[in-house]
């Protein structure tokens, strides 16, 4: 089984997140995508962070595809930081092939994540295009550090077979929706 792991605060979740998930399912040939709602992000302010239960319920509403499973692994496992969460998930599911999925906008700060290189050396990574990040991803520390491990986008469907480090950049339809803009009221009438 091939499972994509798509984590974030999803504050709030919106159709742009669902689009990233759908692109990942299709282009990577995923059997499932685990939409991992985090209790919080140490790199972001918690001032406007909606309660976890609310973000989970909204994520379930937005993620209509039955292959998408909305989870709160970090809270359930009692861990924080993505690297720790992923290590626990992998240890409990040794029969599953995992791919870490992230939007290209998150790639610019990926090097600030705790144990980011460990994540890249443990899981193949699929970076999905986001507005404003199409070219900037090339200058990210992750892509420079692991340039040798890039998998051509045409081979994205076999990314799960690659030993980490391995990563690909996936182009596709993009949504201009942003959780920050929605929270700040900059997207009037936005469908979350």
Swiss-Prot record:
Coiled coil: none annotated. GO terms for biological process: NAD biosynthetic process. Pathway: Cofactor biosynthesis; NAD(+) biosynthesis; deamido-NAD(+) from nicotinate D-ribonucleotide: step 1/1. InterPro entries: Cyt_trans-like, NadD/NMNAT, Rossmann-like_a/b/a_fold. The keyword Nucleotide-binding applies. Keywords: ATP-binding, NAD, Nucleotide-binding, Nucleotidyltransferase, Pyridine nucleotide biosynthesis, Transferase. It catalyses: nicotinate beta-D-ribonucleotide + ATP + H(+) = deamido-NAD(+) + diphosphate. The keyword tRNA-binding does not apply. Its EC number is 2.7.7.18. One of its GO terms (molecular function) is nicotinate-nucleotide adenylyltransferase activity. Pfam families: CTP_transf_like. Belongs to the NadD family. HAMAP family: NaMN_adenylyltr (MF_00244). Catalyzes the reversible adenylation of nicotinate mononucleotide (NaMN) to nicotinic acid adenine dinucleotide (NaAD). This is Probable nicotinate-nucleotide adenylyltransferase. It comes from Rhizobium etli (strain CIAT 652).
């Amino acid at each position: 089984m091939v499972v994509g792991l798509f984590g974030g605060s999803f504050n709030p979740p919106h159709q742009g997140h669902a689009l990233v998930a759908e692109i990942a399912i299709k282009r990577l040939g995923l059997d499932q995508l685990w939409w991992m709602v985090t209790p919080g992000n140490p790199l972001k302010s918690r001032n406007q962070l909606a309660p976890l239960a609310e973000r989970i319920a909204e994520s379930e509403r937005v993620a209509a595809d039955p292959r998408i499973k909305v989870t709160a692994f970090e809270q359930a496992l009692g861990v924080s930081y993505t690297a720790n969460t992923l290590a626990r998930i992998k240890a409990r599911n040794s029969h599953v092939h995992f791919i870490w999925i992230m939007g290209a906008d998150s790639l610019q700060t990926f090097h600030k994540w705790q144990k980011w290189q460990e994540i890249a050396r443990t899981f193949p990574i699929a970076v999905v295009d986001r507005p404003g990040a199409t070219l900037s991803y090339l200058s990210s520390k992750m892509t420079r550090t692991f340039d040798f491990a890039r998998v051509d986008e045409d081979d994205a469907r076999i990314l799960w077979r690659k030993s980490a480090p391995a990563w690909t950049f996936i182009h596709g339809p993009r949504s201009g929706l942003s959780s920050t803009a929605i929270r700040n009221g900059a997207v009037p009438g936005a469908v979350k």
